[in-house]
Amino acid sequence: MNKKTIRDVEVRGKRVFCRVDFNVPMEQGAITDDTRIRAALPTIRYLIEHGAKVILASHLGRPKGKVVEELRLDAVAKRLGELLERPVAKTNEAVGDEVKAAVDRLNEGDVLLLENVRFYPGEEKNDPELAKAFAELADLYVNDAFGAAHRAHASTEGIAHYLPAVAGFLMEKELEVLGKALSNPDRPFTAIIGGAKVKDKIGVIDNLLEKVDNLIIGGGLAYTFVKALGHDVGKSLLEEDKIELAKSFMEKAKEKGVRFYMPVDVVVADRFANDANTKVVAIDAIPSDWEALDIGPKTRELYRDVIRQSKLVVWNGPMGVFEMEAFAHGTKAIAEALAEAPDTYSVIGGGDSAAAVEKFGLADKMDHISTGGGASLEFMEGKQLPGVVALEDK
């Protein structure tokens, strides 16, 4: 990675504005999953141990530039304090006199969490005035919020124009793992692309076809490819306007010598419900009034074999409607194959795939789970991420 990190700069005695991603799921004011808070701990601990005055900033949810009481970060500050085993001060604003006074009170090794930055309309607009106000609080900017790196916001990109800007450890790890996968992968390199819609994965499929040895397709988006081969898909998810594109992807795979794997059998249901009637049918035998909601057992076995033979697997998107028990078997089989394959380095591309490995209790068996759904997707599309571009080069 050619970006400076906190290791490359002196932090002792400095006021460090550290953008983290504490956008955690909440229910009735309680945090239901603190993974994102834990992910930022190495950077925060490093700053504390090296005598920085730590100012943390994050968003939570989508308050749309207004104060939304249930999206305040008080519960986050409390949980962070428990994890760090030290008090974490919190302000009720993210800029202004109260914040300046709180920053002035910080000693070396102290931690202050600012209020939700998305309470300010200028955050998502990347307003230079707000970015300057953030920058005035500090001597150094650290971005450790890979999950928000694809957004050019005031606290992720704008602020970096006014302060020396470096990466935190989580940002560094994400860029190294994903960067190596795209630029210098161990082979055979397999990408597994699932999820509901082709349109969300066009850029990823297009970019990965230049790089992978095997491409595995599953989830709702698979049926547009099945239709492109001339098979009837019944009531399965179908994007009519993407059929030609699906054909062109299969052509491109052939030209590039990429092995393109699609379901050979599927689990179909007579309606979209966990207690629907289901059966397994061959891919060219989907009944006209049924819909395919998961990959079938033969496909699971086929995909498992490909995974076992791969040195690197990047997985983005589930194989079926894994939220429903009846249609979770395909996604679970992929997660288990990745967990069990001894020589396979597994990179889980955030979002639903990350949620799935968590759900099946296999998260600790994965080599790298990306903390950014949208960010990792855009990175795998080959796009430049504004929050990364803004950091200083080594």
From Swiss-Prot:
GO terms for cellular component: cytosol. Keywords: ATP-binding, Cytoplasm, Glycolysis, Kinase, Nucleotide-binding, Phosphoprotein, Transferase. Its EC number is 2.7.2.3. The modification Phosphoserine is found at S183. Its main location: cytoplasm. ATP binds at K201, E323, G350, G351, D352, S353. One of its GO terms (biological process) is gluconeogenesis. InterPro entries: Phosphoglycerate_kinase, Phosphoglycerate_kinase_CS, Phosphoglycerate_kinase_N, Phosphoglycerate_kinase_sf. Pfam families: PGK. Substrate binds at D21, F22, N23, R36, H59, L60, G61, R62, R118, R151. It is found in: Cytoplasm. Pathway: Carbohydrate degradation; glycolysis; pyruvate from D-glyceraldehyde 3-phosphate: step 2/5. One of its GO terms (molecular function) is phosphoglycerate kinase activity. Monomer. This is Phosphoglycerate kinase. It comes from Geobacillus kaustophilus (strain HTA426).
